[in-house]
Regions:
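Short acidic, hydrophobic short linear motifs in intrinsically disordered regions
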Residues: 35-51
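Short, amphipathic alpha-helical interface elements at domain boundaries
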Residues: 2-38
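Winged-helix/helix-turn-helix nucleic-acid-interaction surface
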Residues: 1-11, 16, 51-146
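Short N-terminal amphipathic alpha-helix/helix-capping patch enriched in small hydrophobics
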Residues: 23-27, 43, 57
Length: 146
């Protein structure tokens, strides 16, 4: 798990986010900081208690669809891929692979359980100078063709 996390203003600077209580907003930031490299948090209730948030704050994040709750109690940050992009040499896949297998990804990089493309890490994990794994393979093929 990294020590640095990013936040995308297109998610944070919305009425849906800013109209939530400050305690709920703070919980969202704390959950993001403690998430693994795929955006999963295995102990959201412990984090709630640790930071002084209530379970109502957690329920509000679920209701407003900022986080997705799985049956086993694990959560994932819905907009994780919008917020963060990791290089392949720093990326460590989540331990929650069964939950991850249920996810799809929308065109805007938000996780979903419904409609979307199957999750393909090669498109979202960066290699080197801001290239994804897929982009690197494409560029390599172009170089070989020439």
């Amino acid at each position: 798990m990294a020590n640095k996390r990013m936040f995308n203003l297109s998610v944070i600077d919305t009425d849906a986010f800013l109209e939530m209580p400050l305690s709920t907003q703070a919980l969202y930031f704390h959950l993001n900081m403690r998430a693994d490299d795929d955006g999963f948090v295995g102990s959201p209730k412990i984090i709630c208690r640790t930071v002084g948030a209530s379970e109502d704050d957690l329920k509000l994040l679920i209701a407003k669809r900022f986080i997705i709750l799985f049956e086993d109690g694990v959560i994932v940050i819905k907009h994780w891929r919008m917020h963060n992009t990791l290089s392949v040499n720093r990326y460590k896949e989540t331990n929650y692979t069964e939950d991850k297998a249920l996810l799809k990804i929308k065109q805007n990089k938000a996780y979903t359980l419904d409609n979307g493309q199957p999750l393909n890490d090669a498109k979202y994990i960066e290699i080197g100078k801001r290239q994804t794994i897929d982009e690197q393979k494409t560029n390599k093929r172009r170089t070989q063709i020439r």
